[in-house]
């Protein structure tokens, strides 16, 4: 009998955190955060990081594990996350993967191959120089001709991954996206119960806008000032996160605060749209509409599925 794993995904601001903690309490679970921003130390407000109070003594993994100046790949997440899963299982608890970063979720629940071994340092340096001279969008557009799926899935500001996708195509002649497809892709050692929270788009967008306002009220600007004092700059992977790069532009007097806030809201809404597109392509996902089901009904369904299957 395969070990069960619960996955709770969904777009930003849909309400994953509170529900996941209730589930962990009911199912004797521990949570592995699948969020590409919550991995960073000292970046709490802009990442909507779960607080100690919100955790309610539920163990959380993959939060505050790297400093903002460090590079961190999906392969890194997979290596550390797999160890966390084994630790949770050893305690006879249920591993629960919770978050909105689909690549992170797949790295732990799919038969994912990382093409990290072959490299072309000269070509990579060339692409880096192109991005420096012309901006991230320039190299991102280069993807469009050779790998539509990666072009759609990888954000222009994720320069490292864009460059890796271009590099893989140059080395192998195969699109980066083609390395993780096929009949065996969803085969794992685990019995994966995968749920995605959704709600009406306008309602979700309103929640996103409100959350951004609360982040500003709670001190996002001060958080970014402190990060700048520590020497962290907009060229770092971590500081390209939505909420951070816009406030850094404001602090550098490139845009007004109102412009920064509006850009954060727009960027967050666009991100939520991309997240939903990602989840809809995954045949394992069971979608739970929060406009149709109450939180209690969602809890009951998931608990019933896990305990009776």
Curated annotation (Swiss-Prot):
Is Transferase tagged as a keyword? yes
Query: Which residues of this UniProt protein bind substrate?
Result: 12-17
An example of a Gene Ontology BP annotation on this entry?
tRNA modification
Q: What Gene3D superfamilies does its record include?
A: 1.10.20.140, P-loop containing nucleotide triphosphate hydrolases (3.40.50.300)
Keyword annotations: ATP-binding, Magnesium, Nucleotide-binding, Transferase, tRNA processing
Report the EC number(s), separated by commas if there are several.
Answer: 2.5.1.75
Q: Which domain of life is it from?
A: Bacteria
What is the catalytic activity of this protein? adenosine(37) in tRNA + dimethylallyl diphosphate = N(6)-dimethylallyladenosine(37) in tRNA + diphosphate
Record-annotated site: Interaction with substrate tRNA: 101, 124
This entry's Gene Ontology molecular function terms read: ATP binding; tRNA dimethylallyltransferase activity
Q: Which InterPro entries match?
A: Dimethylallyltransferase, IPT, P-loop_NTPase
Q: Which SUPFAM superfamilies match?
A: P-loop containing nucleoside triphosphate hydrolases (SSF52540)
Q: Where is this region: Interaction with substrate tRNA?
A: 35-38
Spell out the family assignment given in the record's similarity comment.
Answer: Belongs to the IPP transferase family.
Question: Could you describe the subunit structure of this protein?
Answer: Monomer.
PANTHER family reported for this sequence:
TRNA DIMETHYLALLYLTRANSFERASE
This chain belongs to which protein, by name? tRNA dimethylallyltransferase
Origin species, per record, is Clostridium botulinum (strain Alaska E43 / Type E3)
């Amino acid at each position: 009998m395969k070990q069960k794993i619960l996955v709770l995904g969904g777009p930003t601001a849909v309400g994953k955190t509170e529900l996941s903690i209730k589930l962990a309490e009911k199912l004797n679970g521990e949570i592995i955060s699948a969020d590409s921003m919550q991995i960073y130390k000292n970046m709490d407000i802009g990442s909507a990081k779960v607080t100690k109070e919100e955790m309610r003594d539920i163990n959380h993994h993959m939060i505050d594990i790297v400093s903002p100046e460090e590079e961190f790949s999906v392969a890194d997440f997979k290596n550390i996350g797999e160890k966390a899963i084994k630790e949770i299982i050893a305690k006879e608890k249920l591993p629960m993967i919770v978050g909105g970063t689909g690549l992170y979720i797949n790295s732990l629940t799919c038969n994912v191959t990382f093409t990290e071994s072959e490299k072309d340092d000269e070509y990579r340096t060339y692409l880096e120089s192109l991005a420096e001279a012309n901006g991230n969008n320039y190299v991102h557009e280069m993807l469009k001709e050779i790998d539509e799926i990666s072009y759609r899935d990888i954000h222009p500001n994720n320069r490292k991954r864009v460059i890796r996708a271009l590099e893989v195509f140059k080395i192998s002649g195969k699109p980066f996206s083609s390395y993780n497809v096929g009949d065996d892709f969803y085969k794992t050692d685990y019995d994966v119960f995968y749920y995605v929270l959704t709600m009406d788009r306008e309602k979700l967008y309103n929640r996103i806008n409100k959350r951004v306002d609360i982040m500003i009220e709670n001190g996002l600007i001060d958080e970014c000032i402190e990060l700048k004092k520590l020497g962290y700059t907009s060229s770092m992977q971590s500081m390209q996160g939505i909420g951070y790069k816009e406030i850094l532009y404001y602090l550098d007097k490139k845009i007004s605060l109102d412009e920064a806030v509006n850009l954060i809201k727009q960027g967050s809404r666009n991100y939520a749209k991309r997240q939903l597109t990602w989840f809809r392509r995954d045949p394992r996902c069971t979608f739970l509409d929060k406009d149709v089901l109450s939180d209690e009904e969602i809890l009951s369904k998931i608990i019933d599925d896990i305990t009776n299957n």
